[in-house]
């Protein structure tokens, strides 16, 4: 009986470990997305620097530039006060990077698919907003004396073309 009980406990423990491993692998870490309005931007075509910082699943080589070409779509526009709007944007893209100690023939991919908000001022009612991006700058954050890092950083120049009613 004792042997059977220990065997059942061992099987249960293995099942719990497998379940936790599967859950952890499916979980994605949300990106930190910050939009900063550029100095001198106009109300009709505000220009933002969108910084996307994402923790990667595995450490990446800081000397290998990752590939990330995000696309942006407008999900909603809400009037939150006099001439004040809150725009919900969705960013979608795949980060392709070279893991440490792997070589350039071995790459990994990680998806970024997330909503974020940007405040917009408009004296007249907004009917639509069209996002457009400039040249994206990607990199792996370098930590002193380390050739690997799990922190991916992307700076995206984003212009919002605002159509008013």
Model-derived segments and spans:
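Viral structural modules
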Residues: 1-165
């Amino acid at each position: 009986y004792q042997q059977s009980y220990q065997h059942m406990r061992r099987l249960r423990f293995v099942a719990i470990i497998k379940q936790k491993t599967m859950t952890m692998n499916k979980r994605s870490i949300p990106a930190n997305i910050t939009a900063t309005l550029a100095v001198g931007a106009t109300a009709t075509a505000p220009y933002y620097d969108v910084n996307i910082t994402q923790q990667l699943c595995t450490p990446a080589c800081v000397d290998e530039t990752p590939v990330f070409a995000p696309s942006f779509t407008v999900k909603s526009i809400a009037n939150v006060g006099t001439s004040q709007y809150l725009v919900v944007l969705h960013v979608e893209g795949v980060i392709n990077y070279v893991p440490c100690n792997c070589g350039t023939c071995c790459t990994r991919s990680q998806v970024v698919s997330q909503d974020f908000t940007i405040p917009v001022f408009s004296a007249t009612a907004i009917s639509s907003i069209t996002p457009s991006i400039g040249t994206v700058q990607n990199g792996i954050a370098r930590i002193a004396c380390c050739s690997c890092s799990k922190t991916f950083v992307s700076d995206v120049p984003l212009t919002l073309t605002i159509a008013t009613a």
